[in-house]
Amino acid sequence: MLARVGAMTTAVLGSAVFWAQQKNTEPVQANLNLTNTPSTDQSSSEYELKLVQVLFRHGARTPLKSIPDVLEAHWVPDLLEVPDYTKIDYVVTDLQGGPRPPSPVEDSYRVRTLAGGTYPGQLTTLGMKQLYDLGLRLRRRYIQDMAFLSPYFNNKEVYIRSTNIVRTIESAKCLVAGLFQQQQADTVPILTEEAEKEILYPNYHGCRLLKLLSGSRWAESSTLPDIASDLQSIQSVLGVRPHQHLDFILIRDDMVARQTHRLPCPAALDSWRAKVEQRAVDMIWHIYEPSNRENLQLCVGPVLHTLLTNMETKVQGNTSDSDRKLFLYSVHDTTLMPCLMALGVFDMRWPPYAADITLELYQHRHNRQHYVKISYIGQDQKIPGCSDVYCPLTEFQQALSMYALPEESYHTLCNRRADIPTH
């Protein structure tokens, strides 16, 4: 049984199929009705940019599983062609620079093929372009407008880590191609971790307590009165037989993948799209239970701690790592959502393909204090507990202290009460 990456399924306590069904789908467009101010250049004379960290979701992909009992879309190999403009010289390694670890998640996708001949969960040509375009957006800001990064890839400036899944690795590659326009002084290393130790998504295989706590909440999520009623209705509308497993996350995964790639969708879904989006998010909200501090700690505590540690290293400036200017993390929707919940800015919308959370660390030119600015899909966010969009680092650290967790504490917590029976 493996860690979940994306759309969590009822097989939360299952086996390799559990991996394959895990990842959730993606809204076609960001469509954020935010009240936050758009991300603009720093009140530039006052703040000097010191560090950028970007958590980004992979691009558009094939679905993880098709809705049962409905006409399947044909996911043909032509949809996965690699554009020349995304090609770079890169290598995938473990965190120490050794061989890439095995990927049980990817292996689970390749035990079956979708109609049309491709595997589930594969980055498509459209997804590659989406990440290339995100790289272009970062290039405009950090190379052209702010002259913060070198115009070519430099391993001393840029650190790249991805979950050990082909679509996230390829997404990282495409972003780097857009960011540096295929100009590189070094081979681009993309670092990965073995599945059991992965912290870049809620790891239900590596953290027994998380699996225990989430298992019952996953089962509950489809039985909540409003969700259960709507699920019964849509199952009837689609003509899905009662014995087939179906939930709104699975429906959304297939629906949005088809919609994004302009492939035929069951006509019966047309009037249900908004409801499917809403109920899928309702399920995730229930499963992650953001009001439960411990649950978010187990989901993304080590990720948040890593982001804070990178900032502290930059502030201290006394190690070779302090030369880094950009950290890139290629992750999943199920990484971004609990991070947004912990930050207090989740807008109850599913993160679209190529969505990003960007953390910028600044130093004020006059008082020499450090500040953090967060944006989500290019929109500045005022974090609860912060006095301004430019949040004093001490305030930001305090705001995340409830959820950030060093890996040692994380492992201790994961192994605590792991033998408590589910309820």
Report residues per predicted region.
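Signature for phosphate-centric chemistry
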Residues: L2-H423
